[in-house]
Amino acid sequence: MRLLRTLTIIFSIFTTSVVLAQQNLPVIKANQTKISIKDGDEPVTHYWNHLSTKVKPIVYNVLKSNVSRNLTFYTDIDSISFNVSPGKSYDFKVLLMSKDTCYVKLSTEENSYSKICNNCDSLSDTIQFIFSKSEEITIKGSLNNTGIVDLIFDTGAGYNYFIGNGLNEKFGLKINGLMEDESVTGLATEQTSFPNQLQISSLKWNNQSITYIDEKGYTGGGVIIGYNMFENKVVKIDYDKSLLILSDELPVDISGYTSVPMRHTTGGTYIELTIFNGKKEIKGWFLFDTGASFALSMNADFESKNLIKDGMKKIGTGRIASTESDYQEVDIVLAPKIKLGDIEISDAPINIGGKNMFQLKYAGIVGISILKQLNTIVDYKNQRMYFKTNNMFGISLKKK
């Protein structure tokens, strides 16, 4: 009885301390559920979960950086700022419409996975993928233990997505939130589900948020996993061997690779690329996006400012789409040459898109038609990327 009494007292003290901690959290106000965040020197971003009382707390996973910086969380009528550091979380409350309390957590903690295997203390983890006919990095995995499902690794995505039509219950997705999702065509309000479990081979991720897009025509369902899954790792994409290799450090041998500076931001991962239009060279920062089905796309404002089309041949028009029903018309021009580090690629088609296609601070997107020709090492923590030509290098970038 003494042991039971002692445990009861300890539990009571713990519960009381948790309640007091929640009571002492800072409070801001909101009249609307949409929010914005300014993370360090980056522009204010709007692609975040809506405030809700259904999920406690609502976790906002901000940039996983090794740099401390100031971060401000905005509602429509109020704001709160924190000096954030790597591997930390910051809690507060939002009083919504003067009556509902939303519990909020800003997190710079890494999205780590666990290993469900014996003697798996290796320095790296290897994932086999299939490079599909539609040029997608496709991995076999599972969602909420509901059976095998295709997972597409999209380096341009910062979140996980499920795309299907009326399939949320089949795959164990509990729809309990909304978010503003940003794609090449702008912002759209989508449904979200939390928590979820994803598994690839012996690697398991718990407490994952998934954005659910109920798209007509997608009867089988599929998952898109973003860079958020591997943000704490060095990621090697080997198209020759169809392997993803995850490690904590750069490989010992990176001979033959060219090093390229990168910017990993709240809006994505960007690499510096040089375009030669026949008259001059222009440098810009492009989103590193294995989920984009083209070679290059460019923000219309960046093109206009640098007169990039001047001297380049228009070879057609096209569409850039985030879904079958959500797209933008674009002009397609041909760049005589582009450079990525020491690697030169000839006759690269560029889609010239609209103003709202990307964060205006950046030039555009480099897609899979170029990236598939280059084995890649992404060092997220140290902001460097490494490229090496592979067996697909030299394939024409022009669509047949």
Locations of regions flagged by a protein language model:
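Bacterial Sec-dependent N-terminal signal peptides
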Residues: M1-P26
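Pepsin/retropepsin-fold aspartyl endopeptidases
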Residues: L20-K400
